[in-house]
Amino acid sequence: MRGFILMKSLIEEFSCGAYVFEKGDTLDGVAEKFNTTKHVIICDNNLTSPPLLGQAVFIRRSESVITVGAADDIDGICRKYGAQKDEIYRLNKVNFIYPFMRLIVK
């Protein structure tokens, strides 16, 4: 019972859920399904290789992930989401953005 309580409190505290990888799943696909990024899933689960079939991972649901539009630029995104350019680059471990990129804007 203690493990269940710990799991429940972690899920509530971090607004996350568990996802079990199924045949055909990819990190990119699962990240898109839960409106997050592959990088967030890898870091949150300390993954060093792709999840195996049947492996459960924690998924932090984030409303702070956007898809960069064709006409978007970093300054416009910063204004729209009240974010700092350096912080967006740091969170995403990138030095530039491009259209259709999934971007953490926290």
Where are these regions (language model features)?
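Generic detector of short, aliphatic-rich beta-strand segments that form the cores of beta-sheets
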Residues: L53-R61, P99-K106
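Alpha-helical scaffold segments
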Residues: R2-E13, N45, L53-G54, N92, ...
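LysM (lysin motif) carbohydrate-binding repeats in extracellular/periplasmic proteins that recognize
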Residues: E22-P50, D73-M101
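Primarily a LysM-type cell-wall glycan-binding module
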Residues: K8-K33, Q55-Y81
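A broadly structural signal marking compact, well-ordered functional cores
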Residues: M1-R2, K106
